[in-house]
Regions:
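Bacterial N-terminal signal peptides
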Residues: 6-17
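A solvent-exposed, charged loop/short amphipathic helix patch at secondary-structure junctions
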Residues: 179-194, 241-262, 402-408
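Mid-to-C-terminal alpha-helical segments outside catalytic/metal-binding sites
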Residues: 22-50, 69-97, 104-114, 372-374, ...
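H/E-rich (His + Asp/Glu) clusters that bind or coordinate divalent metals
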Residues: 29, 303, 307-308, 312-323, ...
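Active-site beta-loop-alpha junctions enriched in small/polar residues
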Residues: 53, 140, 156-162, 229-233, ...
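Histidine/acidic residue-rich metal-binding segments in metalloenzymes
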Residues: 203-228, 235-344, 359-376
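Histidine-centered catalytic micro-motifs
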Residues: 45-59, 285-293, 324
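Alpha-helical scaffold segments that flank or form the walls of functional sites
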Residues: 42-43, 61-155, 160-161, 177-192, ...
Length: 444
C-alpha cells in the first residue's frame, strides 16, 4: 500500500513538471489513475447547485410553465437504467426496473422518509446526501417545505412580457396553448402581490409595477436572481425600440385589443431590456434559458444563445451579471466565447443529463480550457412524477457532473495542460466558488 502511495505521488509530481512544459495533444497512460484521484477529490467538495427546480410532483409552482406532451431525449427516459441506480443509491431500491408493481415500493419508501424528515428537513436531508452546500430553487413561488437558507430563490420574470390580449399568441401552435396561459397566470399573481386589480393605466406605472415586484421579491422573499425562459415563447433576438415606441403600444392595448406580432415583439423587446437594466441596478443576476428546449415547436435557429450576442455585448448592460443557463447547448463550443465578457457566466445543467459523461467530459474540458473562471455547475433537477422525482433527477445530475469533471481534469493534467493544484482549484471553482461569488448576500 505504501509503495502504491509513493508511486502515485511520483505520478502527480511528474504531471506537475510536465504542465510547466509544452502540453501534449493526448493524455498519457496515467489518465485512469488520475481520474480515480480526481473523482475522490470532487466527491468531497460541497457543491452549489446553480440551477434546479426542487419540489414534489404535485406542486404546481415548481416551474412557471409546463411541458407539453412530447418525447424526452434518450437518457432522460424512464427506461434509463441509471435512474434505477439513483433509486438504489438514495433509497436502497431492491428492484432492477420501474414496473408498476415495483414502483409502488419506491413511492411508499419516499412517503416513509418524508414522515421521518417533516417540513423543510426532507429536501435539506437530500442536499446533505448529495454533498450540496446549497441548491438554487428556480420556481414560480417558494413552498414552505424548502428551507430558504439552503434553497435560495430565483424567480421568473417572463410574464411581464405578456400583459395584453394573447389570443393570437396562443393560437400559434400547441406549445403556446400550454405556455401562454401560465404566463398570464403568473402576471396576475404578481399583480395580486402588489395589490393591483387591473393593469396600470400608464406605461410609467407599469414599469414601476415591474420594479416593485423585483424589489419586493429581493428584499422580502429572499430572491437572489431573475430568470427568463423566454426562448420557449419567442425568438431570442431583441431589437432596441425606444421608450416612446413601447409606451405607444401599451397605451393602445392595455385596455383591450390584440397587438400585431411586430407590435408585441417591439413592446417585449423594450420590457426585456428594462428588466435586465433593473437586474443591474438591484444587483440581481439575470439567468436566461439558453439551450434547446422541450416541446414540438421550440425553434432552435431563432432561440439559440448566439441570438443574444447583441444584448450581452451591449456596454449599457456591463453592470448586469448574466448567467447562461444550460450553457447554450448544443452550441456550447461557441457559447463559451460569450464568457469573454466580464459579466457573462456559463452554467452546465441539462448538458450533463442529455449527454453521457464521456460527451459531457469533452464539453466541460473545452470550457475549462477556455474560461475556467466563468463556468458553474447545476443539475436542472425536476420532479417528473411520483416515482422519478426531483430526488432521482438530482442524483443523476450530480453523479454525471462530478464524473465528467473528474475525467476532464484527469485528461488536462495527464496532457500537461495544468498542474494538480490548478485542477483542484478549478474543481472548487466549478462546483461551488464561482457561482457563490455572484451572490454576496449568501456569504461564502
Amino acid at each position: 500500500m505504501m509503495k502504491n502511495t509513493h508511486l502515485f505521488a511520483f505520478i502527480l509530481c511528474l504531471a506537475s513538471s510536465i504542465a510547466s512544459a509544452q502540453a501534449r495533444p493526448y493524455p498519457g497512460p496515467d489518465v485512469q489513475q488520475l481520474y480515480q484521484h480526481y473523482l475522490e477529490v470532487v466527491s468531497h467538495i460541497a457543491a452549489f447547485d446553480h440551477h434546479a427546480h426542487p419540489g414534489f410532483a404535485d406542486d404546481p409552482d415548481v416551474d412557471a410553465m409546463a411541458a407539453p406532451p412530447g418525447s424526452a431525449a434518450f437518457r432522460e427516459r424512464e427506461t434509463n437504467p441509471e435512474l434505477v441506480a439513483a433509486a438504489k443509491a438514495l433509497w436502497g431500491y431492491p428492484y432492477n426496473d420501474f414496473s408498476a408493481e415495483h414502483a409502488k415500493w419506491l413511492i411508499q419508501k419516499k412517503a416513509e422518509v418524508k414522515k421521518q424528515y417533516p417540513g423543510t428537513a426532507y429536501f435539506s436531508m437530500l442536499l446533505d446526501k448529495l454533498n450540496f452546500d446549497r441548491g438554487v430553487a428556480n420556481r414560480a413561488l417558494m413552498p414552505d417545505y424548502l428551507d430558504p437558507k439552503r434553497f435560495p430563490w430565483v424567480f421568473f420574470v417572463d410574464s411581464f412580457l405578456w400583459p395584453f390580449d394573447n389570443s393570437k399568441e396562443r393560437a400559434r401552435n400547441g406549445d403556446q396553448q400550454v405556455y401562454i396561459p401560465l404566463q398570464e397566470k403568473m402576471l396576475h399573481r404578481w399583480m395580486q402581490q402588489e395589490k393591483l386589480s387591473a393593469l396600470p393605466i400608464s406605461f410609467a406605472d407599469y414599469l414601476k409595477f415591474i420594479s416593485q415586484v423585483l424589489e419586493d421579491n429581493q428584499k422580502n422573499k429572499g430572491g437572489i436572481a431573475i430568470k427568463f425562459e423566454v426562448a420557449y415563447f419567442r425568438p431570442l433576438h431583441f431589437s432596441d425600440p425606444t421608450r416612446e415606441e413601447a409606451e405607444a403600444i401599451y397605451k393602445k392595448y392595455a385596455k383591450g385589443g390584440v397587438p400585431s406580432e411586430p407590435e408585441y415583439r417591439a413592446f417585449q423587446d423594450f420590457i426585456f431590456r428594462y428588466l435586465i437594466t433593473e437586474g443591474g441596478r438591484l444587483k440581481l443576476p439575470v439567468h436566461i434559458h439558453s439551450a434547446v428546449g422541450i416541446g414540438d415547436y421550440f425553434n432552435i435557429s431563432e432561440s439559440n444563445i448566439m441570438q443574444l450576442e447583441n444584448v450581452l455585448r451591449d456596454p449599457r448592460y456591463s453592470g448586469t451579471t448574466f448567467v447562461m443557463i444550460h450553457g447554450g447547448y448544443p452550441l456550447e463550443r461557441e457559447a463559451i466565447w460569450l464568457a469573454a465578457m466580464k459579466n457573462v457566466y456559463m452554467e452546465s445543467s441539462l448538458m450533463e443529463i442529455v449527454m453521457y459523461p464521456a460527451a459531457f467530459k469533452d464539453a466541460l474540458k473545452q470550457w475549462l480550457e477556455t474560461f475556467p473562471d466563468k463556468v458553474t455547475f447545476g443539475t436542472d433537477c425536476f420532479p417528473y412524477n411520483d416515482v422519478l422525482g426531483a430526488e432521482e433527477s438530482y442524483w443523476l445530475g450530480n453523479q454525471s457532473a462530478r464524473q465528467g469533471l473528474a475525467a476532464a481534469l484527469a485528461e488536462m493534467v495527464s496532457s500537461g495542460e495544468i498542474t494538480d493544484a490548478k485542477a483542484i482549484e478549478m474543481a472548487h471553482a466549478y462546483l461551488h466558488d464561482t457561482a457563490v461569488s455572484l451572490y454576496p448576500s449568501l456569504g461564502h
